[in-house]
């Protein structure tokens, strides 16, 4: 090979790395955010692909040099320590070592650890992580981020590389803001106009392609400093155009230089306005605060550096005016309303969930202070410490620092703190000692660090790959760049030859390939999981249908009573015409779950959901075949028979159930797999308890399994309901009522299950005495029992409900005047149904005095006035309502009735008046 060809080959290889780095930056900072902020398996796959492309670029560079120097600094060491923590959490440990690291685990799994042969057929738990599948997935994400960030940090000594990275960040921030605004103004409720996300939609607020508005606003805040750099530093080397002459070489005239710089500046200011506007319309309080922090830090720093003059100050004022004007046109009231919550005591005193989540997180850290409970485990751990949450799952601790401490312990929090402090120190060093270009870069990334640090105090943005990747890139770049300027941030330098570096690169490719393959499988599993969840929702629509109205029911229980907004729920087994449809839906759901587990066998919830679905299908199939005996009846018969051998029991079971026994065996297998992958699955422990008689005649086994379920899910309504059923079977009525009372209070959906069990056996007044319901519970009892009870039988319940409403009114009138009118309407409706017409009229008049423009009180006052034969008031109110709804035929009928009644009343008075 000639010298020229060798030189050409070397130059080609050297030019490949920038191309690979640019491609990896686009994948990591544009594609990942577009995949639901990276919280979708496809987003994980994009992140791994970004790391893989970066490694390919590194290998291309290695191939062009016989030897190359590498710097290992604080950032690289912290990434290595983080990976080590994740590995330790996954490795099986001896009982002695595990008890030292996580002593609380023995209290969580008393029957799993102390009864390895009798509880569930499993041995004791031997890992720090309580959800190994989630920890492994989180470790794969962190590995991809670490490799990607490390490769970029190695190139931090070249400012051109950093400028390219900043330009990609600017592009990503701008494109996400544009998508968010366009989707908000002209969207169809789907993400990117085609993806129907399972848990929420894209309407209501600006959230772009993120699943949560807080995450979207956080990403914009992290990119605000880069957009500021793009705006105020209008040349390729980071200097304003008027401060450099080198750029003029690329243009024919000086005027072209200034024209290009002016175009970039104008574009930058428009981009700043759009990003700020999108962040404000996200209505994320923490996100708006983070954007304000980034803007403040950026502008002050740019001013101190000297790139903001009087023209730029004027342009900043115009940009702010543009944003405010846009908000005046659309969204200012919503934004100001959200920001008012920062200073509203009632927001914190009246159901502000973050306080409870933070307390629960602190309790978890106290119990697991060393290495935590495992990466990605917060969603499974928090229900142990949280009070009843009405079915809401808190996937994170609403605070990045607390969440990190819960999942990785104080060790992980300490490492994270070192990284934050090191990044801040590095930024300060560059702002004081760096070159002009380095100061501008430090401002852009320093604003991201400040915004991320502020927002992290009110939300866990670090588990969103799009946000955490950008934050890691900012911190690692600052540390790497500052380590070349100051010995305070040491870095170890070593050399690798071409062969060793290539081997290391190939090893990373293999690891990333394996990680990407698992994420690829997860991406295939996700649609099946979403289908299963939607089928489950359709089953709920079948199961939660209202009961048929009894002939003795209260005809005034009012289908149009807007205050009785509780959902009428009954299990599917009570609706015979729908049993076949429910069985078909369950079969489709089971098929989807089997596909999920085929691609992702470590899914934390699919196994338990599959086990429950099999049990439900078993019961419905038996019911459809005409068998009325329940699984509980079958268990009692099996235990009472006292079979002499296992073979005789299996023969009896096969004769009794036929092929349906296979469904129960598969359900037990699925439940065992569930507790093996996620021992905090209370529902799986309940399934094992229900089916324990299949493998042991000892009733104590079922009791132990139910107790285990209550330990790991002490406030789960379904678990408490099953525990109450088990207590009733065992003859402990007092404990059964206590557990049902807790289940009733746990969630709205569980209330219906408890009430359905009591509907045909216990009067409504006795249910109120036994369950001690709150206002929502009284509403549910009123609605359900009204279908089968007389008004007199419901009188006591409605009086209790009225007292509860009045007590709520006393609270809301002083704290939340917005919620007071609906409560007054509910009180008036109850007073009317109780026969106290005068009190109902007075309540409605009071509601109208507070807000005369409300339609519903006027509409109800018509009925009340007619009941009182106050035809003048009735006519006045009907005419008022008709002015607002002139097309209403029912109001026209009422007007005719009121006029005729008033006329008849006047004629009667004339006929009865004395003659003169």
Task: Give each language-model segment a name.
Residues 96-128, 196-197, 364, 376, ...:
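Extracytosolic (periplasmic/ER-lumenal) interhelical loops and adjacent juxtamembrane/interface segments
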């Amino acid at each position: 090979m000639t010298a020229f060809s060798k030189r050409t080959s070397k130059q080609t290889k050297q030019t490949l790395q920038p191309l690979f780095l640019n491609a990896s930056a686009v994948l990591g900072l544009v594609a990942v955010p577009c995949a639901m902020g990276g919280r979708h398996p496809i987003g994980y796959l994009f992140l791994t692909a970004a790391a893989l492309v970066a490694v390919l670029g590194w290998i291309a560079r290695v191939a062009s040099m016989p030897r190359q120097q590498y710097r290992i600094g604080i950032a690289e060491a912290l990434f290595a320590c983080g990976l080590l923590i994740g590995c330790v959490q996954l490795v099986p440990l001896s009982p002695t070592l595990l008890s030292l690291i996580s002593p609380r685990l023995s209290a969580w799994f008393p029957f799993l650890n102390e009864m390895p042969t009798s509880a569930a057929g499993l041995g004791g738990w031997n890992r720090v992580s309580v959800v190994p599948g989630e920890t492994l997935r989180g470790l794969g994400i962190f590995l991809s981020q670490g490799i990607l960030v490390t490769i970029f940090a190695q190139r931090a000594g070249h400012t051109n590389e950093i400028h390219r990275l900043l330009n990609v960040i600017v592009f990503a921030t701008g494109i996400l803001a544009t998508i968010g605004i366009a989707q908000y103004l002209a969207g169809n409720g789907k993400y990117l106009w085609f993806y129907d996300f399972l848990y929420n939609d894209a309407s209501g607020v600006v959230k772009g392609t993120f699943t949560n508005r807080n995450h979207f606003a956080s990403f914009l805040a992290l990119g605000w400093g880069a957009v500021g750099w793009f705006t105020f530093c209008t040349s390729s080397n980071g200097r304003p155009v008027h401060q450099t002459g080198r750029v003029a070489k690329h243009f024919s005239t000086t005027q072209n230089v200034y024209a290009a710089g002016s175009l970039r500046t104008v574009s930058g200011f428009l981009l700043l306005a759009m990003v700020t506007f999108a962040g404000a319309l996200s209505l994320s309080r923490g996100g708006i605060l983070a954007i304000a922090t980034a803007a403040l830090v950026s502008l002050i720093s740019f001013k101190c550096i000297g790139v903001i003059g009087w023209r730029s100050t004027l342009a900043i004022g115009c940009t702010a005016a543009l944003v405010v004007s846009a908000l005046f046109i659309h969204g200012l009231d919503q934004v100001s309303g959200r920001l008012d919550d920062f200073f509203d005591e009632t927001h914190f005193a009246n159901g502000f969930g973050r306080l409870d989540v933070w307390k629960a997180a602190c309790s978890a850290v106290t119990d697991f202070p060393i290495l935590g409970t495992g990466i990605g485990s917060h969603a499974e751990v928090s229900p142990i410490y949280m009070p009843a949450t009405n079915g809401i799952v808190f996937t994170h601790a609403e605070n990045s620092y607390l969440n990190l401490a819960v999942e990785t312990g104080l060790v992980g929090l300490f490492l994270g703190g070192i990284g934050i402090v090191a990044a801040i120190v590095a930024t300060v060093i560059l702002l004081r000692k760096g070159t002009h270009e380095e100061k501008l870069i430090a401002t852009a990334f320093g604003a991201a660090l400040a915004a991320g640090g502020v927002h992290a105090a009110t939300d866990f943005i670090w588990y969103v790959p799009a946000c955490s990747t950008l934050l890691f890139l900012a911190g690692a770049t600052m540390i790497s760049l500052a380590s070349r300027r100051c010995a305070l941030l040491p870095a170890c330098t070593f050399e690798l030859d071409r062969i060793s570096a290539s081997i290391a690169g190939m090893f990373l490719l293999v690891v990333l390939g394996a990680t990407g393959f698992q994420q690829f499988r997860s991406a295939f599993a996700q649609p099946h999981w979403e289908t299963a969840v939607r089928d489950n929702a359709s089953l709920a629509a079948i199961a939660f249908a209202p009961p048929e109205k009894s002939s003795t029911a209260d005809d005034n229980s009012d289908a149009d009573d807007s205050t009785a907004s509780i959902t009428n729920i009954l299990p599917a087994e009570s609706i015979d015409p729908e049993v076949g449809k429910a069985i078909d839906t369950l079969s489709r759901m089971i098929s989807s779950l089997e596909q999920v587990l085929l691609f992702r066998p470590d899914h934390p919830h699919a196994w338990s959901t599959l086990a429950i679905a099999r049990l439900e299908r078993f019961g419905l199939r038996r019911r459809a075949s005409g068998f009325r005996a329940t699984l509980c009846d079958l268990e009692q018969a099996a235990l009472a028979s006292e079979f002499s051998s296992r073979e005789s029991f299996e023969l009896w079971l096969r004769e009794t159930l036929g092929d349906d026994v296979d469904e129960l065996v598969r359900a037990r297998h699925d439940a065992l797999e569930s507790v093996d992958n996620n021992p905090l699955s209370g529902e799986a422990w309940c399934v094992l308890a229900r089916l324990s008689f299949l493998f042991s005649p000892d009733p104590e086994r079922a009791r132990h399994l139910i107790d285990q379920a209550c330990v790991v899910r002490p406030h789960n309504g379904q678990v408490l309901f099953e525990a109450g059923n088990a207590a009733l079977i065992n003859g402990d009525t007092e404990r059964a009522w206590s557990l049902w009372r807790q289940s009733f209070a746990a969630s709205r959906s569980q209330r219906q299950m408890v009430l359905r069990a009591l509907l045909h056996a216990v009067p409504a007044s006795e249910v109120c005495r036994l369950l001690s319901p709150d206002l929502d519970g009284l509403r549910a009892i009123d609605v359900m029992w009204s279908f089968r009870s007389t008004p007199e039988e419901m009188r006591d319940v409605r009086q209790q409900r009225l007292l509860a409403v009045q007590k709520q009114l006393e609270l809301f009138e002083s704290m939340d005047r917005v919620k007071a009118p609906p409560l007054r309407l509910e009180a008036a409706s109850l007073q009317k149904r109780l026969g106290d017409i005068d009190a109902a009229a007075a309540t409605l008049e009071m509601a109208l005095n507070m807000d005369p423009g409300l339609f519903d009180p006027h509409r109800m006052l018509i009925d009340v006035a007619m009941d009182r034969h106050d035809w003048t008031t009735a006519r006045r109110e009907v005419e008022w309502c008709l002015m607002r709804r002139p097309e209403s035929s029912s109001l026209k009928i009422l007007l005719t009735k009121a006029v005729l009644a008033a006329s008849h009343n006047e004629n009667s008075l004339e006929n009865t008046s004395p003659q003169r």
